[in-house]
């Protein structure tokens, strides 16, 4: 008995080696098997499915995000080219408007100058005709005066 006291507990102490230990080991193994087959495997499958679902959704979201970023870049490029095109069209329209304005102004000036020249020529013609008529009348009048003076003598 002394040897047992030296190595550990005595009967009814902390640890008794009897049929309880193998029975407890069998219970632990059976409980582990039952829990593994009834709880851990189904829960593990559900967790794996959920992880796969989440990872697939993350991959899909990353793909969609990259597609959206690409589309955004394309739209920004298209918007910039549309703005450039609109500015070019506005500039061309302004240039065309200025050109038409200058042409209309030049045409109006030419017409005004032509009307002015026509009026000047008409005035000169009428002045010349009036001078000729006055000259003729003066000649007629002087001839008439000369004839009367001659007749009176």
Swiss-Prot record:
Keywords: ATP synthesis, CF(0), Hydrogen ion transport, Ion transport, Membrane, Thylakoid, Transmembrane, Transmembrane helix, Transport. The chain crosses the membrane at residues 23-40. The keyword DNA damage does not apply. SUPFAM superfamilies: F1F0 ATP synthase subunit B, membrane domain. InterPro entries: ATP_synth_b, ATP_synth_B-like_membr_sf, ATP_synth_b/b'su_bac/chlpt, ATP_synthase_B_chain. Pfam families: ATP-synt_B. It is found in: Cellular thylakoid membrane. One of its GO terms (cellular component) is proton-transporting ATP synthase complex. It is a single-pass membrane protein. GO terms for molecular function: proton-transporting ATP synthase activity, rotational mechanism; proton-transporting ATPase activity, rotational mechanism. Belongs to the ATPase B chain family. F(1)F(0) ATP synthase produces ATP from ADP in the presence of a proton or sodium gradient. F-type ATPases consist of two structural domains, F(1) containing the extramembraneous catalytic core and F(0) containing the membrane proton channel, linked together by a central stalk and a peripheral stalk. During catalysis, ATP synthesis in the catalytic domain of F(1) is coupled via a rotary mechanism of the central stalk subunits to proton translocation. PANTHER family: ATP SYNTHASE SUBUNIT B', CHLOROPLASTIC. F-type ATPases have 2 components, F(1) - the catalytic core - and F(0) - the membrane proton channel. F(1) has five subunits: alpha(3), beta(3), gamma(1), delta(1), epsilon(1). F(0) has four main subunits: a(1), b(1), b'(1) and c(10-14). The alpha and beta chains form an alternating ring which encloses part of the gamma chain. F(1) is attached to F(0) by a central stalk formed by the gamma and epsilon chains, while a peripheral stalk is formed by the delta, b and b' chains. This is ATP synthase subunit b'.
């Amino acid at each position: 008995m002394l040897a047992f006291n030296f190595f550990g507990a005595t009967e009814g102490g902390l640890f008794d080696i009897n049929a309880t230990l193998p029975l407890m080991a069998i219970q632990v193994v059976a409980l582990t098997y039952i829990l593994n087959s009834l709880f851990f495997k189904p829960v593990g499958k559900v967790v794996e499915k959920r992880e796969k679902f989440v990872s697939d959704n993350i991959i899909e979201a990353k793909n969609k995000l990259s597609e959206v970023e690409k589309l955004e870049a394309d739209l920004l490029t298209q918007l910039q080219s549309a703005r450039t095109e609109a500015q070019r069209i506005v500039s061309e329209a302004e240039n065309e408007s200025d050109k038409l304005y200058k042409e209309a102004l030049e045409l109006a000036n030419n017409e005004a100058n032509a009307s002015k020249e026509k009026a000047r020529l008409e005035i000169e013609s009428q002045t010349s005709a009036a001078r000729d008529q006055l000259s003729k009348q003066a000649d007629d009048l002087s001839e008439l005066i000369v004839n009367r003076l001659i007749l009176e003598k």
